Structures are given as structure tokens and as C-alpha cells.
Amino acid sequence: MGGGFTAGVGMARSFQRENVTDKVVFGVMGDSTFFHSGMTGAAEIIYNNARMIPCVLDNRITGMTGHQENPGSGFTLMGEEAPMLNIEKIFETYGFAPVLTVDPQDLTAMKKTVDEAVAALNEGKHPAIVTRRPCLLIKRIKQNLGMCKVNADKCKSCKSCLKVGCPAISMENGKAFIDRTQCVGCTVCAQACPFDAIEKEEK
């Protein structure tokens, strides 16, 4: 854990040494990992002038090991309110700019943010990206996103929705099918469908 940034520094510096400019290195980690072992890696990016883009996937919880709180969640491990450390300000303090924040479930905004970060990198800057969307399993955050369904008449069986990697989506009778017991209504599949065959329905 935490190797997303440090390994990225090594790769980026290797590319720089060989004058490879057509590849961009992205270092990715979650918010919890950033706080416990990623901040030193972020410092290494600046210190070594590594041509890479650090990305923190902030879901406001420690999803990997059991939903423990972290310094960015606003609560201690005992559930008491605590100061909420700001990832963007930490990046800015290290010298990253621009620091871009985006909702990762908005695919258009996400692509625009990545393009903006790459453009800044090509200008010699040190951009950073923070994607922020609370985990749906956080009990204290009530999120009712409804769910999605497939309009079989519009579905062309192109399987673009399967590329999203959502466990709720499969193929049934030659058409895309969404398991209602697993769908959380994020609409990423609907955004990926080129035929508008996936529709949102409110709960």
C-alpha cells in the first residue's frame, strides 16, 4: 500500500531519463492509504520532479479493510467527531498545481479532468487529481440513488455496459441485463451506453 506514488516516481523518472514524452504515469491510491503511507510518496513526486499525476480516490472511508475511519472522514476510530483533513490542501502545500477535484461517477467530467491534468503536466506543472464520492455502504450517509434498468428494445447487444465492470450487469437472452438486487443506481453504465438503452428509475 502506498506504492502507487513511489512506484510511479520510479517509472516516471525512467521515462524522463530516456526522453519518453508520449506516455503519462498515473499513481493511484485511496484516501486512507494516502493518509497512512501516501503523503511521503507525494512529497517524492515533487522532490524528484517526477513527470506523473497522483490520483487519490476519496470515498470517505477505509473500504479495503472494514470501513475504519481515517483522518479525512471527520471521525475517530471510536466514532467521535474529529477534524477532517483536506487532501487538496495537502497536495497544494507540497507544491502541486493545479489540484483538480471531480465526481468519478460523472464520466464526462472525469475525462475532462484527466485531459486538463495531462495538459498541465505537458506544460511542466505538477497536477494532482482527487476523485470524491462517498462509499454507498457508509451507514451515516444516506444515499438513495434509485437504480437502472435496460430497455431491451433499444439494447443493441454491443456490450459497452459490460466494460464498466459492474457486477450487477450481465447478458440475458442476448441483451444486457441489470440485477436489481445489486444495482446502486450510479448510472455509470447508462453513461457508457451509446444507444441510451439504460434508463434510470427512482426507488
What spans do the regions from the language model cover?
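Thiamine diphosphate
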Residues: 1-128, 140-141
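Short, ordered loop/turn segments at secondary-structure junctions
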Residues: 57-60, 104, 133-134, 174, ...
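Feature representing long, continuous alpha-helical segments
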Residues: 5, 9, 23, 27, ...
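Iron-sulfur cluster-binding cysteine motifs and their immediate structural context
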Residues: 156-177, 188-203
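Poly-acidic low-complexity segments
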Residues: 86, 103-106, 151-156, 179
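Flexible gly/pro/ser-rich segments immediately N-terminal to CXXCH heme-c attachment motifs
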Residues: 150-151, 174-185
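Short, exposed beta-strand "edge-strand" segments with a Pro/Gly-rich flavor and a Y/T-containing core
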Residues: 80-82, 144-150, 177
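Glycine/aspartate-rich loop-and-adjacent alpha/beta segment that forms the canonical ThDP
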Residues: 118-171
